[in-house]
């Protein structure tokens, strides 16, 4: 089976604000590691690390983590795209 990418495009704020992590190098590292989430354990570990290092994450950071977890689960289910348009969410299968 060919390898494929899964993309997620939802109408939610999902980012790390400067008020949460101001150091750009740390922020870039965290973005890369969040993008690498593949399992529930990865998600739990990342959330725990964020809490320990930077305090309580806001809604945008929690959304970012949830989207990374959703993307990993969707990929395992051979979903290539999750796209929200208005109130409709479309799932495209491989």
Place the predicted regions along the sequence by residue.
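Accessory helical-bundle/CTD segments and flexible terminal tails appended to RecA-like ATPase motors
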Residues: 1-94
